[in-house]
């Protein structure tokens, strides 16, 4: 049996020469989030044609046109907006980021005059209790979710260092100058947005609260005002593993990069944010049509410098000026062909984008995991692996795919939910009373449910539990039929890619029926030589299809 090694090097090698021009343009399209002028759309709308031709990554919604504040752009009422976002999703061939600036206070696209709830500014919230802030952000998150928004360019984690700062401090967009307060209230918003499957985008890296200028209008130099303390909110939140996306600022700081503003700077985005702060998520630019950038760099320069600096998603709001998606794609495509942008960087950004879509699509449905079940798990580890452990955390190194042998989702869930083994599992009952479990359960329609933390041990495979993540699939009727669906296949592929990116320690992906191939490996810990069962799940064809897809 071939043990599948899911490594980035292999993936890139296999794909290095197989990319067509059309495929490349679609990958470029995935890296774009753009504004468009319509409050309603149909199949003839330009944004729909762009989504379908270029696999557009996302859109940003505004209530008004920047140059004509009396003219409605994308938002007029809750009902209208909900229909618009529904249509956007239905027309888009791939998962779409539908984004908005909804910080609260002065920066809020969903306003009471359109029928939405009012959200206080960050400064106002900072004078409240954390509990009150949670209630406020819960209400806002529900409003965003109901409207079909899945990405919010908030919270603002800029420190209010300069009282003369107009664009952040003057507009009450900062929670203040106290780092702990900024972190606490930012977490409050992020927590509520996460519960509603809304991506939080921290901004404006590396800090805009000390500036005197407005990057919307022109060049902003913070070389003499910026302080390293402005990095601390990012450092703290990144270390907690809570940050999926960060927006760059168009500020210039000669102490870090003597040539380029942060958005276009490798020193800021890769060396500082990626390498020093260890950020693994997505980097999105602030609007590349702002004066701080557009007045000094051509479109080709803006896009190529940003991508090479480490930016994954390019934002063009089409408020300050207008540019077509076709022109954006063709400009970047030309830069790639000229060798000014690496194809591998395009691939890497696309992989991160798809992984984030997978993450926000996962439904949380926890199984019962009381202290009793944890104690049973520790006893299992002691009995079968001869390890004394303080907790049940693991380092994932393998993903094992299964089927439940049950055709109904709820019955499959109930089989995994109980703490104690069911009476019909005589084949493994002597080994432990601990019930079987898995980290994920994939329904017939491809919906992924997370049942327990990925880094806790589940009982799902003999010998390898202590280093593996288990993925169960509803199906495999009576343990005889290879009947898992195409939707489940696609979901498993997406989930494997997401988990591998999250846990670089994962090197192997196997079917449950292949587990005995590991008996002589260092990962195998089972001490009972008689404790083995024969397995057929999730089917040889299913595993072959998964591997073929991962190889492409």
Model-derived features with residue positions:
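N-terminal catalytic cores of peptidoglycan-degrading enzymes
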Residues: 364-461
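Second-shell residues forming the walls of enzyme active-site clefts
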Residues: 42-46, 59, 71-91, 96, ...
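Surface-exposed loop and adjacent secondary-structure segments within mature catalytic domains
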Residues: 112, 140-225, 514-530
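Hydrophobic faces of well-ordered beta-strands that scaffold small-molecule active sites
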Residues: 30-36, 57-61, 96-102, 151-155, ...
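Acidic, His- and aromatic-enriched active-site or binding-groove loops in soluble protein domains
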Residues: 121-132, 170-192, 220-235, 528-552
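Sec-dependent N-terminal signal peptides
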Residues: 3-13
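Basic/polar, cationic surfaces and motifs that engage anionic cell-wall
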Residues: 144, 366-374, 480-552
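N-terminal hydrophobic targeting/anchoring segments and the immediately downstream early-domain regions
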Residues: 17-112, 311-316, 362-364, 394
